[in-house]
Amino acid sequence: VYTKLAKQAYPDLPVILGGLEASLRRFAHYDYWLDTVLPSIAEDSGADLISFGMGEHQTVEIARRLAAGEPVESITDVDGTCYLTDFDHLPEKYVECAGFRKVASDKVAYAKACRIQMDNQDVVSGQIIVQKQSEKYLVQNIPAKPLVRWELDKVYALPYTRRYHPIYESMGGVPAIREVQFSIIQNRGCFGGCNFCAIQLHQGRRVTSRSADSIVEEAERMTHEPDFKGYIHDVGGPTANFRFPSCREQMLRGMCTGGKHCLAPTTCSHMIVDHSDYLKILRRVRELPGVKKVFIRSGIRFDYLMADPDDTFFKELVEYHVSGQLKVAPEHCAPNTLAYMGKPPIETFNKFKDKFYELSKKAGKKQYLVPYLMSSHPGSTLKDAVYLAEYLYKNHMRPEQVQDLSLIHISEPTRLRCI
C-alpha cells in the first residue's frame, strides 16, 4: 500500500523493497490471512526492485549506481535482487518454476516450484530463477554472497544505542526490548533445514559467524551501559550452537539440494561437529568484569549437540548458561509428523532430555526444558496430535505455548501435504 502511494505521489522515484517481509514474498506465495495464493510482492506493490536476504551488499551497490545517475530500470544484474520484466528481456540462462496462475490452482505445481526456489538459494550452486506472474516475469538473480567474518565484525562494531526509537517513549516504551537489549548475535544462517522454516530462504543455509574478539568486545561495551545489570541474555543467532559451515564440501560445491538435510533423519557423515570455538567465546565473555551471567536463549540444536562426542560444552551449558529454563525445539513426537517437518526422531530428543536432567542434577541445579511444539503441520493427523498429548502427559510436560503453523514460504515436503 505505501509503495503504491509513494509511486502515485512521485512516479519517477525508485522504490526498492527489502527486509524479511519482502524477501519471503518475492515469488508467488500463499497468504495465511487471506487463505489464497498471491503473486510476487513486486507485482502487488509496484516496487522497482526487491532486495532479498540480509541485503548489505545489494544496498551499497544499488545506492552507488543510483547516485552515479544510472536509471533503476537498468539495474537488473545485482546479486540478491529480483525484478519484473517481459519475456523478450529475460536473461540468457535461467531455471523456470511454475507461474503464479499455475501454482495458485495446483498444489503439486506449487510444491515443485518451491523445490526449485529452495534449491537455488545457495551462493555457490544457485541459478537465476524465473517465474511468470500475472503478466510479467519475476527474475530472481543468484543470492548475494553472505558477509564474511571481517564484514560481520564491522557491522556489529557500529555504535548502536540498544534502545527503541524515542517516539515510543510516550507510549510507555517497548517492553520486549528487555530480552534483546543485552543479547549478542554471533552468527547468521542455519543448516538445520527444517521444512517449515523460512530462514534458509532469507539468511540461507550457509553459516557465517563473527570473530571471538568481536563478540567479546561487544560484551565488554555492554558492561558500560547504564541499564546493564550484569546479565547477558543471549549469545546466539538463528541456531545458537552453529559457528561454521556444516561440512567442507559445501564450501566447494554448495549446499546439498533435493531436500537433503544435514541433521535429519540422521546426522550426515560429512558434517563437522565441534563446539570448542563457541565454548571458548562463552568462557571469555563470562570472565569479563561486570558480567554476572551469560545465558543462551536463542535455541540450541539438540541433535547437533548430541552428535558431539565431547560433552564438555554440554556440561558447561548446563552449569553456566541456563537461566532456569532452556528452550529447545523437538516440535512434535509423532514419527510421521517429524518426517514431514524434516526433524530428527523423538528418540534423539529423549536422549538429550535425559542427559540434560542428569547433568543438571550433578551440577546441583533445578532446571527445566521448555519444548517448542507445533500444531497443524501439513501431514500431521489427529492421531499424531493424540500421540503428542500422551507423550507430554507421560513426560510431565506442560507447555504454555504451542505454535500453530502459519504458511508463508516453506519447502517441498511440507508443501506437498498442504490441503
Positions of predicted regions on the chain:
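N-terminal [4Fe-4S]-dependent radical SAM core
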Residues: 108-183
